[in-house]
Amino acid sequence: MGSDKRVSRSERSGRYGSGFDRDDRDDRDNRSRRRDSEYKRYRDERSDRYDDYRDYDSPERDRMRDRERRNSDRSEDGYHSDGDYMDHDYRQDYYMDEKESKTIMLRGLPININENDIRELVESFEGPQPADVRLMKRKTGLSRGFAFVEFYHLQDSTSWMEANQKKLVIQGKTIAMHYSNPRPKFEDWLCNKCGLYNFRRRLKCFRCGAAKAESDMEAPSGSSEAPQSADYYSDSGYVSSAIILRNIGPHTVVDSILSALAPYVSLVVSNIRLIKDKQTQQNRGFAFVQLPSALEASQLLQILQTLHPPLKIDGKTIGVDFAKSARKDLVLPDGHRVSAFSVASTAIAAAQWSSTQPAQQSGEGGDYAYLQPGQEGCSNYGQCSQDYQPFYQTQTGAAEQGTAPQAESSSPVPATTSAVVCQSPQMYQQPGSPTQSSTSTVAASATPASGTSAEEAAAPNAIVPGLKYSVPDTSTYQYDESSGYYYDPQTGLYYDPNSQYYYNSLTQQYLYWDGEKQTYLPAADGAGQSGTQPNGANPGTSKEGKEKKEKPKSKTAQQIAKDMERWAKSLNKQKENFKNSFQPLRDEERKESAAADAGFALFEKKQGSLLERQFLPDMMMMVNTEEEKPPNTALVAAYSGDSDNEEENERFIGAVDDEKLMDWKKLACLLCRRQFPNKDALTRHQQLSDLHKQNLEVYRRSKLSEQEYEAEQTERESKYRDRAAERRVKYGIPEPPEPKRKRFAPTVVNYEQPTKDGIDNSNIGNKMLQAMGWKEGSGLGRKSQGITAPIQAQVRMRGAGLGAKGSSYGVNTSDSYKDAVRKAMFARFSEME
């Protein structure tokens, strides 16, 4: 019963009562809670690191546990739905039931280890040799502590694990080995309408707005389990006509690969694609071998995987496997996922690559199809290839005419993605096989854009002038680094932001957008003359021209950029010359006449219109039809002070005949297009108007040739211009500044010094002492034993007490600084003696 005794009020509130015990219990609870939280976070991080870098399918129990954790324990926003993490048990053994796999994971590796060390150690053991060794690294290049060792077959990995008893000693440290099993991902969902992969939390497609439920209902049978093996293909589930070679040396060439594979298969240079870095031009470590069929590829793969010792090229062990894509965008009926982006971009890259390779004759066997109809694996990608057939054919046609840009500029293909996939059999046919019409495919697959007319359904690079199109959206254009221009994926045109013109690579024609007609219209004929025409355009060429026509040269994106730049420069130069002909005179040649300024403003405002730009030819026609010539005596008059000087007038009159520009019958100035009431007004306008002089100068400049105009411009620039004199004339000479005042020394005020000459008998103190019996000259005190002179005010040294030696140097308050220094010097000198 003692434990049931209630605590009294005094004990609860006492200084050393149970409050101290309660605080101790709270501290223990906090420490326990913090320890559990840290243990939980450590287990989460450990689990995430392990799950993120497993490469192959996990057991069913792990899949169900991961699915429940993602779908139940996490909310839509990505965070855990249950806030009490301590209710969960994280102390699970992840390695209780490992599924055997041909990939082995090495954990607990030293930080300073590299792939070569692991590869040499693994290859030093007797038995099966690994196909590939991958060490996971951080961004800094250091090891993350784990690596993957992949074998060719499952029995090789299991026998190697049993031989080493799941342990390995590297640099004196025991390393644990486990089978690598992946964790499938179920977060994202695929839109069946547009083929876009959306996040799990989206209820509608980000591109087309289709509901998520529609895609779930339209999913093919067996697609629910397809994601489990979508990212990784099993040993017997995926075959391809292409083989990937890993661990290629940085300086290995195609000839070395051909010589290494020569004992097993007969290949040519066009069957091998060696991937290189664009910046360093060195190999990126892998290459692709394209074979005629998937059957031959599987046979070659089986031969290379069973080699003992394994295949080596330039001293490096080569890993061999089917070329496969790790990107998932399209779900096929058999459960595989194929990237829509990779299919289209790889098709374009393959077309560009094949067009640059030397043409092989049909008898040599070098022109192979990726996958032919009826072969194994082609049915898996038939639907995907048909969807992208129009776009692929258009890009291939552009490559054949030599006007398509480089593959990496229009549709870049990541080097890390395996670049060999099944293409449509229509593009790569064996000699003699029938081909389908590309135009029918384009017409069948092209669909008009939403909100536009049916005429807008033209395929890319098939712009027809006159048809209506949607307003171009420059925000969707893709920048082409190789050419420096922007590519429109909808129309296939190249856009130059400087000249705002479009370039059609198929027709080699320059276009511009007409907002009123909602269409692309061709530019002027003379504007596109600088563009390069297709080879073989003239039917009457010689035999050499026919031979060149048979071998068209590939026109790269750099050549297209040079053509557009040259054409834009010619247009800008024409515009600049036309604007220079209408440039007004310089500021010093402008006068202060208000009427002339107003007239010139109107003239400058109207000169931009097309009708006003044609006034010079109209004026010349009127001058040529003039029959009678006015008398020259009417022009003799004196210029006013506001007009130009005599040299300028002589230059104007000598260069241009002013009389041809006057209509004396209608009393009008043909140059300024003004009519006057009488002859005197017309004469004054001719002689005094600044507007007439400026227009005359513009007309004179328009008649000059380009060389004469440049010479005149150079002469004007070289002529010295006294701008200071112009400012003095216009604004006047400023007044000189006021002289600076002299600084006067401050006046010295003499203060009163009543005791400077001594104290006389008239002061009050002297009178008081005399009243008490004191006489002048006697000392103070009863017996006159005191001082006889008055006390002098003296300056003491700082810090010295009264009466201390050296406390006073005999300096008085009335002494000057010079006297005080001299007395202090003498006092210190006497102290030293």
Swiss-Prot record:
It comes from the Eukaryota. One of its GO terms (molecular function) is mRNA binding. SUPFAM superfamilies: Ran binding protein zinc finger-like, RNA-binding domain, RBD. It is found in: Nucleus. A zinc finger (RanBP2-type) spans 185-214. Residues 429-458 have a biased composition (Low complexity). Residues 1-87, 396-458, 523-559 are annotated as: Disordered. Gene3D superfamilies: 3.30.70.330, Zinc finger, RanBP2-type. Residues 761-807 form the G-patch domain. InterPro entries: G_patch_dom, Nucleotide-bd_a/b_plait_sf, OCRE, RBD_domain_sf, RBM5_RRM1, RBM5_RRM2, RRM_dom, Znf_C2H2_type. SMART domains: G_patch, RRM, ZnF_RBZ. Keywords: Metal-binding, mRNA processing, mRNA splicing, Nucleus, Repeat, RNA-binding, Spliceosome, Zinc, Zinc-finger. CDD domains: OCRE_RBM5, RRM1_RBM5, RRM2_RBM5. Pfam families: G-patch (PF01585), OCRE (PF17780), RRM_1 (PF00076), Zn_ribbon_RanBP (PF00641). Residues 396-428 have a biased composition (Polar residues). GO terms for biological process: mRNA splicing, via spliceosome; positive regulation of apoptotic process; regulation of alternative mRNA splicing, via spliceosome; spliceosomal complex assembly. Residues 102-182, 241-325 form the RRM domain. Its main location: nucleus. GO terms for cellular component: nucleus; spliceosomal complex. A zinc finger (C2H2-type) spans 667-692. Component of the spliceosome A complex. Regulates alternative splicing of a number of mRNAs. May modulate splice site pairing after recruitment of the U1 and U2 snRNPs to the 5' and 3' splice sites of the intron. Component of the spliceosome A complex (also known as the prespliceosome). Appears to dissociate from the spliceosome upon formation of the spliceosome B complex (also known as the precatalytic spliceosome), in which the heterotrimeric U4/U6.U5 snRNPs are bound. Belongs to the RBM5/RBM10 family. This is RNA-binding protein 5-A. It comes from Xenopus laevis.
